[in-house]
A protein has these predicted regions:
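A cross-kingdom feature strongest in bacterial/archaeal respiratory oxidoreductases
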Residues: 1, 30, 35-39, 324, ...
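N-terminal export/assembly segments and adjacent metallocofactor-ligating motifs
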Residues: 1-24, 32, 36, 40, ...
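Residue-level detection of beta-strand-connecting loop/turn positions
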Residues: 8, 54, 796-798
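N-terminal single-stranded DNA-binding subdomain of primase/primase-helicase replication proteins
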Residues: 45-63
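Short acidic (Asp/Glu) and glycine-rich catalytic loops that position anionic groups and cofactors
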Residues: 61-66, 189-192, 405-411, 543-550, ...
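N-terminal leader/propeptide and maturation segments of large enzyme subunits in energy/redox metabolism
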Residues: 94-123, 129, 149, 159-165, ...
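Short acidic, S/G/P-rich loop/turn micro-motifs used as interaction or catalytic elements
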Residues: 315-317, 371-376, 553-559, 613, ...
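Active-site phosphate/pyrophosphate-binding segments
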Residues: 411-483, 487-610, 691-720
Length: 844
């Protein structure tokens, strides 16, 4: 830690921190327009100027210096900022009219803050054509060229789709004499550029550029001219689509003349701390019919008579708690196949420190295994990209399917394709590289073999050739001829020199030396050749802060038990941090609270709670203003209509807040029929079991915000893991030797949602551009002789599934990426995992 003095106040800050971030952490305000926390500074607005030890600097890109004296609000600085704002306000009315940003516009705020009361400058307006991409509308006439959109697209999202390009606009040099240097620089930048979409592939369902825009230049298409900022009520909640559990804010306003019916107009995020994906931003249009259901008795009878309860991966902690209590009372089984595999995995892995998303950003090397990272947890993908761009980290993404979106993040991003089912072997490779002893490595060691080191052999031959040439040149010098021959005998040793007794032994040894390298047949069979092995090893040895991301495909792996034991050993014996991506929004909460059973698809009476069953208790998926699309037997509130909590990837228990009214019953009302006393779900929040890591904190006392020093004050972190006891019992037995791949698994189908699709709510959303369906690469689409939007039927044995065909720009391989929602009751597909071989049924 170092100390600085800002405006007479002594503060402590981290070495390497920018002056701006240090000031913000200490609660000292320095105005900015272009800066985004955690991203590279652009120095576009220059509003963050300060005096540091008597010299003017820009605080966003100036590193904190020990004992520095800084002033942020001298009269000179305030005059300079006012001058800059006057240039921003050229031809811009100070009383904004119909602009959607009015009331929350940073240009308005800064204009008032700096005291701009008149406009001394004027220039002819230029024609600037409107543009649009994905869900964004771009009005360059309102753009101030702060380039926040470019910055977040590059440093957070990792797409590089936006760029500041040249524009031929009026920028008279006469202002150079009347404007200050910084103000003229800002003016020139604004008048000579425009934001353009330069992506090589289309952009879908993102909107982070809309979120960061400080003015009205970028807006959400469906929000345009529908509501004013000051009319909207902000409800801070948690996104429940994936395990990231991002902080979101619902912007809600009455929709009818009586004010009884409310509508979510948009979703915002705290973009300084938490970028969100398109699902969190746009899939807010699905909820339950507000009246709910009245057939409580029918739901209670169904639970009394059932043999099992199938639960969804997004049920709240409180709902999971009630269901587990009822299981103990009625002795039924609880099914959720994804969460079951995750729970079994955790029972072997045990207590492992969960790195925060911020820790991912500070890593030097990130390795992913068993994960299609961009679809499973976008926030983790954003954090990895941020580490690559700002921390100069490297990425090794290991998966049977190459993801070009990851490969193109930067030059230090390496996508390694391997055989299906090889994850256990790859983990053994990491243990070997880290010199961690384990019985698991026996089969790997047994497959060791030596091969000729072609590169070293070539270098040796070059060296010998060079030595021979030198010897021949030496022979031309008479008096040194014999001496040179003697000196070069050993270096030029060949079989012809066998008769030379003096150097006989050395020559034989020299000629017998052939440079070799060690390889492992097990790795070769898994798809890891020697070059790839050496690249991974070099990156691993170079890094002093490595992070291993484990995806959901690992939990259902045939060798999941052994993989979990190997990961526990890795965590204990090395400094590598493990990030486990839960397979659904609240899988960690469910696994911590419920005793799950493996579903064997026998004929049983099953009640589905936020899942399908013979009797279904779930949201009826009503898109606002339309009829419900899902038939359910008892309507529950959707997750944007209730109070409760979920547990995210960091093990953080986070609050859900209702944005829309719901007048019906929830699960706590059903449970009252079994003697439970809780009148609503939040009466369970502080009763969640402490032995499972939860804390006795009431729902209303849960916080949900970030502070300027980037500290996370959202909910609370789980305590001691409930899985450590069982994991210690598993430690009594050694890891099993890694199983070789008996044969390569041929596949042409992969079970995975596209980006922004996670569950029933996202499937039903009409706001999202990416839909559930069958996705293929551009080359495969051409080979199939089909077009996007056509229906395609795939078969497996005697079963068929049909879906709409879409294009995945990040794919190269000839594979059908099938959305899980298409399976429905087609149990013949993907019996052995998420990879399968299917047939294309030709249309009649």
């Amino acid at each position: 830690m170092i100390t600085m003095n800002i405006n007479g106040k002594t503060i402590e800050c981290q070495e390497g921190q920018s002056v701006l971030e240090a000031a913000r952490s200490a609660g000292i305000y320095i105005p900015t327009i272009c800066y985004l926390s955690g991203c590279s500074p652009t120095v576009a607005c220059k509003m963050c100027m300060v005096e540091m030890d008597g010299k003017r600097v820009y605080s966003c890109n100036t590193k904190a210096k020990n004992s520095a004296v800084i002033l942020t609000n001298t009269q000179t600085l305030m005059d300079e900022r006012k001058s800059i704002m006057q240039t921003y306000d050229v031809n811009h009315p100070l009383e904004c009219g119909v602009c959607d940003k009015s009331g929350e516009c940073e240009l308005q705020d800064m204009t008032h803050l700096t005291g701009v009361e008149h406009q001394p400058y004027a220039v002819a307006d230029d024609f600037k054509a409107l543009d649009s991409w994905a869900k964004a509308l771009y009005d360059p006439n309102l753009c101030i060229m702060c380039e926040r959109c470019v910055t977040t697209c590059k440093d957070n999202v990792g797409e590089n789709n936006l760029k500041a390009t040249k524009a031929d606009l009026h920028a008279p040099d006469k202002f150079k004499d009347s404007m200050s240097k910084d103000a003229f620089s800002v003016w020139s930048r604004k008048q000579k550029g425009i934001i353009s979409f330069v992506g090589s592939v289309p952009c879908y369902d993102c909107g982070e550029c809309i979120a960061v825009c400080p003015v009205g230049a970028l807006s959400y298409k469906d929000f345009a001219y529908t509501a004013n900022a000051w009319e909207l009520k902000k409800i801070h909640s948690t996104c429940s689509h994936c395990s990231a559990g991002c902080l979101i804010s619902y912007d809600v306003r009455h929709f009818d003349t009586l004010g009884e019916e409310s509508k979510i107009f948009r979703v915002l995020n705290d973009f300084y701390h938490n970028p969100i994906c398109g699902a969190g931003r746009f899939a807010f249009d699905v909820n339950s019919s507000p009246k709910g259901s009245a057939n409580l008795k029918e739901a209670q009878n169904a639970l009394k008579e059932c043999e099992a309860v199938r639960i969804g991966g997004d049920i709240t902690n409180e709902e999971a708690f009630l269901i587990e209590r009822l299981r103990k009372k009625l002795d039924f089984k609880i099914y959720n196949q994804e969460a079951y595999h995750f729970q079994q995995f955790l029972k072997v892995l045990g207590e492992v420190k969960r790195p925060s998303v911020e820790e991912i950003k500070t890593s030097h090397l990130v390795i992913t295994i068993g994960s299609s990272i961009k679809t499973e947890n976008p926030l983790v993908r954003y954090a990895i990209n941020n580490a690559l761009k700002l921390n100069k980290a490297s990425l090794i993404a290991m998966h049977p399917i190459k993801d070009n979106a990851l490969a193109n993040l930067c030059r230090s991003s390496f996508c390694i394709t391997h055989e299906v089912g090889a994850e256990e072997i790859l983990l053994g490779m990491l243990l070997k590289m880290l010199n961690i002893e384990s019985a698991a490595l026996k089969s790997l060691e047994d497959s060791k073999q030596s091969i000729v080191d072609e590169a070293a052999l070539k270098a040796l031959e070059e060296e010998r050739k060079k030595a021979l040439e030198q010897a021949e040149q030496g022979c031309s010098v008479g008096e040194n001829k014999a001496e040179n021959q003697e000196e070069n005998k050993i270096e030029i040793a060949t079989p012809k020199e066998e008769n030379q007794e003096e150097n006989k032994t050395e020559t034989k040894e020299e000629s017998a030396e052939v440079p070799t390298k060690t390889t492992y047949l097990l790795l070769e069979e898994a798809g890891i050749n020697l070059e790839t092995y050496e690249k991974i090893l070099a990156l691993l040895q170079k890094s002093n802060n490595t992070l291993l991301v484990v995806g959901e495909e690992i939990y259902s792996h045939k060798q999941a038990h052994n993989i979990a034991k190997m990961l526990r050993l890795l965590a204990q014996k090395s400094a590598i941090k493990l990030v486990l991506i839960p397979p659904s929004a609240n899988a960690l909460g469910i696994a911590s609270l419920c005793e799950l059973s493996e579903e064997v698809f026998e004929h049983e009476k099953i009640v589905g709670i936020r899942a399908q069953g013979d009797f279904t208790i779930n949201s009826d998926d009503r898109v606002f203003g339309k009829d419900a699309v899902s038939k359910v037997d008892f309507i529950l509130p959707s997750l944007n209509q209730l109070e409760g909590t979920i547990t995210n990837i960091e093990g953080r228990v986070l609050p859900l807040k209702p944005a829309l009214r719901f007048e019906g019953y929830d699960l706590s009302d059903i449970m009252q029929g079994f003697g439970f006393v809780e009148e609503n779900l939040t009466e369970c929040t502080h009763k969640l079991p402490t032995e499972a890591g939860f804390k006795a904190i009431e729902f209303d006392h849960l916080t949900n915000y970030f502070t300027n020093d980037r500290v996370n004050h959202r909910g609370y972190l789980l305590g001691t893991s409930p899985f450590e006891k069982s994991a210690k019992e598993c430690e009594t037995t050694e890891c099993e030797p890694i199983k070789p791949l008996k044969e390569k698994i041929a596949f042409n189908a992969y079970l995975k949602y596209p980006e922004t699709q996670f569950n029933n709510a996202t499937n039903k959303s009409e706001n999202l551009q990416l839909k559930a369906g069958v996705y293929v690469s551009k080359a495969f689409l051409k080979k199939l002789n089909k077009e996007v939007g056509q229906s395609i039927t795939l078969s497996k044995e005697e079963e068929e599934l049909t879906g709409v065909l879409y294009l995945d720009e990040s794919l190269d391989q000839e594979v059908f990426v099938i959305s899980p929602s298409l399976l429905k009751n087609h149990s013949g597909f993907f019996r052995e995992g998420v990879f399968d071989s299917v047939d294309l049924k030709e249309q009649a």
